[in-house]
C-alpha cells in the first residue's frame, strides 16, 4: 500500500528549503548558484563579466602540437626493457601451434577489417563513375 506522504528527494529538499537557481527565498537571498549582483560599479561599466579561464600551456601552438602527437603511440619504458613483451612485426604471427592471426588483433591499428575490404571494393565497382557516363 502506498503512503500519502510524498517520499524521495523532493521531500528532503523541501525540508531543507531548496529552491531553483535564482529564485529568491522569503528572507530575500537567492537560491544556490544564483548570480550575485555586482558589488560596485556605475551603469556604464561592464560589471559582472568574468575573465576567461587561463590554463597553463593552453595556447594555440600547444594545441596544434598536441593534435599531431595524439595518434602517435609511444611505447612504455617497461615494454622497451623487457624482451618478452616485444611483439613480432610480421603481419601474421602464425605457426603450427598458433592459428594465423592478423597484426591488428594485438594493437588495433586498422579501421577496417581486412575481410571487409573486397566487399567494399565490389560495392564501389558496382556503382562506378562509368555507369553515370552512359547516355543510353
UniProtKB/Swiss-Prot annotation:
Biased composition (Basic residues): 66-75
Location of the region described as Disordered in the Swiss-Prot/TrEMBL record: 1-100
Taxonomic superkingdom: Eukaryota
Protein name, per record: Putative uncharacterized protein encoded by MIR1915-HG
Amino acid at each position: 500500500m502506498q503512503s500519502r506522504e510524498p517520499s524521495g528527494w523532493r521531500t528532503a529538499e523541501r525540508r531543507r528549503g531548496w529552491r531553483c537557481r535564482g529564485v529568491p527565498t522569503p528572507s530575500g537571498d537567492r537560491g544556490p548558484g544564483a548570480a550575485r549582483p555586482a558589488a560596485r560599479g556605475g551603469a556604464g561599466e561592464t560589471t559582472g563579466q568574468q575573465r576567461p579561464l587561463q590554463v597553463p600551456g593552453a595556447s594555440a601552438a600547444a594545441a596544434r602540437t598536441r593534435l599531431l602527437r595524439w595518434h602517435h603511440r609511444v611505447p612504455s619504458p617497461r615494454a622497451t626493457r623487457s624482451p618478452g613483451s616485444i611483439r613480432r612485426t610480421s603481419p601474421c604471427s602464425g605457426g603450427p601451434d598458433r592459428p594465423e592471426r592478423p597484426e591488428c588483433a594485438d594493437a588495433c591499428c586498422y579501421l577496417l577489417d581486412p575481410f571487409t575490404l573486397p566487399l567494399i571494393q565490389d560495392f564501389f565497382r558496382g556503382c562506378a563513375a562509368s555507369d553515370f557516363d552512359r547516355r543510353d
